Amino acid sequence: GRYYVYGYGTFQGSKTQLESAITLAYDTYGTVVDCDSKSVWKRYRSTQASIDGVSPVMGGSSLENAVTTVCNYLGADYNAAAYMEQGYTAVQTMNMISGVHGISLTGITCEKALSYVGEGSLVIAKTGEDEYIIITAYNSSEIAYIESSSGSVKTMSMNDAGKMFS
């Protein structure tokens, strides 16, 4: 698809890669919209956000646990891990939920990803070779997340999170 960037009060350009559009919107204090004029990403986010009611699921790989946890939170009535074991990607697995549109982003900073949490969307972030976390909350100084390999709820300073995702 194509993404349109508005910043500094005017149209800044269009991009085919969402990551590029987010970077341009970030640099111009703007917003990214899709071809249907739906907001996809906003530079401005609230100073804190929290998504409650997320119950960690264990039993698979770190990624399977993360995707299953998010799918269950979103109301999936199927076994997400089973689909992933059949070769479905995380995004394909989430997109089977009615009204859900998962996206995959590579190379964006933690700060940019937090805009999604601020809009009420959980973020699965890769933190190592086979390690994933689910970001559930943030404030001005730290993020809260579920470590999907252990199910533990933890916090990390915004500074450390910035280093982890850079």
Language-model segments: which ranges?
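Short aromatic-glycine-(Arg/Gly/Cys) micro-motifs in beta-strand/loop hairpins
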Residues: 1-10, 30-31
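A short, charged, amphipathic alpha-helix used as a generic interaction element across diverse proteins
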Residues: 15-34
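Solvent-exposed strand-loop boundary residues in beta-sheet-rich modules
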Residues: 9, 36, 149-151
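Conserved active-site-adjacent core of cysteine acyl-enzyme catalytic domains
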Residues: 46-166
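Surface-exposed loop/edge segments in extracytoplasmic proteins
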Residues: 10-14, 41, 152-155
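Residue-level detector of conserved, well-ordered beta-strand and adjacent loop positions
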Residues: 6, 16, 33, 136, ...
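Short, mixed-charge low-complexity intrinsically disordered segments
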Residues: 29-45
